[in-house]
Amino acid sequence: GAETPFLRSKKLSNHYTTSTEAVIDSIKKISSESEKYHCCIYPTAILTQKKDLVNGYKKIKITKADYLIPVTSYDYSPLRPLEKFGSNWIKFKYNKYKKTRSQDLPELFHDTGTFYFYKTSVLLKNKGNLPLKTTYIMIDRIRTTDINEPQDLKIAKLQYNLLKSIKKNGR
């Protein structure tokens, strides 16, 4: 049922166009450069809740940030990855951390790939470069999956059903 007010130009209709390029193009096409903030919601943000958007908008305004990114914690430390070499072997990517217990490594976060808030003037000027005044809201890992592959969609469906069950049973 949704209507599309415009289509991307051929130049921006490829697998190499960044989200930022598409958002800037959209802002210009709808002549909304004078709006203070814009929000980009990804179509794969199926676990995003209204409260996430409301809290994100409130936080970017209150903190006077230039960008707001929803983040979540890694379920494992990205500082202890293994990489393949040859056809049968793996090794630590970072020898510095190979003897460090994962619980002793700093907690790191990644964006959820669900939505972003931008101060319009900064977005148009920086063209996607992350400004120093970037804030965040924390999203529970159970409510986020960056959907890029068919397996990611299966995981998101499992998460959705789990969240639905938790809500139904009041847990």
Q: What are these model-derived regions, one by one?
A:
Residues 2-39, 47-55:
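Short phosphate-binding loop-to-helix
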Residues 11-15, 76-77, 142-145:
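A short acidic, often aromatic-flanked loop/helix-cap motif at beta-alpha or helix-coil junctions
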Residues 136-138, 143-171:
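Hydrophobic helical membrane-anchoring modules
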Residues 1-2, 85:
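Short, structured coil segments at secondary-structure junctions
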Residues 16-21, 46-133, 138:
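Conserved core of the sugar-phosphate nucleotidyltransferase
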